[in-house]
Amino acid sequence: MPIPLLAEGFGRGLSGIPYAWPVIKTVPWIALVVLLKWYFSGATCRAERVMHGKVVLVTGGTAGIGSAVVRELATRGAQIVLLTRHAPNDPFLVDYIQDLRSQTNNELIYAEQVDLASLHSIRLFATKWVDNAPPRRLDMIILCGSVMTPYWGTPTTTDEGLEEEWMVNYLANFHLLSILSPAIRAQPPDRDVRVLFSTCSSYIGAQLDLANTDQKTKSGSVSYARSKLALMTFAYAFQKHLDAYKRPDKMDNNARALIVDPGYSRTPGTRRWLSGGSLVGLFFYLFTWPIWWLLLKSADQGAQSYLLAAMDAAYGQGAGGKLIKECRELEPLREEVQNEDIAKTLWQFSEKQIEQLEKDAAIKRAQAKKEQEAKKENEEATKRQKKEEAPTKNAAADAKPKAAASPKTDAASSATEQKKQTPGSRRSKKAK
């Protein structure tokens, strides 16, 4: 078939080939779309690593890029511990883990309830993990959990009074790693321990304003960018914190902090941001979906830089504190993230903020507990009072029928006495 068509084309020209000109006009556009799709799909991770026996903690591992990372690591045999706000018996979480186990042929996938919007929830989990004796194995922590307010939405606040994006995207990670730090440093010197932070290019235009973290900002994008800038600053400071630790065995530090920028991807968070969190915006997103399909990565494509940071042997040795994007190392575009003075100020501010918030939350929990106990005591007192009043009411109820029946009894007794007295009186009359 192709040979006769080519022969016809050489003999009679393109006019002799059916649909030749439409095909010639269409092919360049198809090639352009394919080229753009290839370009925006990003780099692919070529690294491989045996993950059998590795214990990996993951936040944000039930959706988006985090879900793709979890699936790839579980396929390679890693033991996954998902940190999620859902209870372990939540139907969604149960089905998700069962599906993941069957897809990856890996039964070592578990979940722990950790609400990143609650400092108390984070402390409960982290202290339980650290208090284990001997220290539990920990090979990797992947921090994918984050929230993003739609571009025309207003950021919300948590129950503890913090802006949600500041709390979930930054302070939760700071709090979690601050408590887990002893467990990270207690790992054997031959163990390759990695901590993966998640960032976004929005940090480039952010301002690290620490004065208004407990207030709603006017723009969700501003709040999100600020939280990512703070997280990057903390990541570099955390690496220095690990390096400064002197191991009892005199060995070098074996834990490395790596910062990963996955690029713009079609995740649930991105979809919510583009749609504005509204039904009209969702219709707009669906209408323009071909554009987002072309320009944005899929979740699997966005996970490639995470997989490189998790599996490439080069990141298991040498210095940490590296930024990875498109599967290659880059230098941060903001000098502040590596500034020691700014990092120290941020660290101290975060510690004081957490201390104050936990004190306030503890007072609220104590008050709520007292109110609950008082309510319970009142309910028990009411029940006891009802039980005590019940016999009295029953006795009164029994006394009323007896009182009502007493006149009839008296009348009957008097009639009986009269009957008894009648024969005697008759005999006395006859004697007279």
Pin down the residues of each PLM region.
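Hydrophobic "lid"/C-terminal helical patch
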Residues: 43, 306, 310, 350, ...
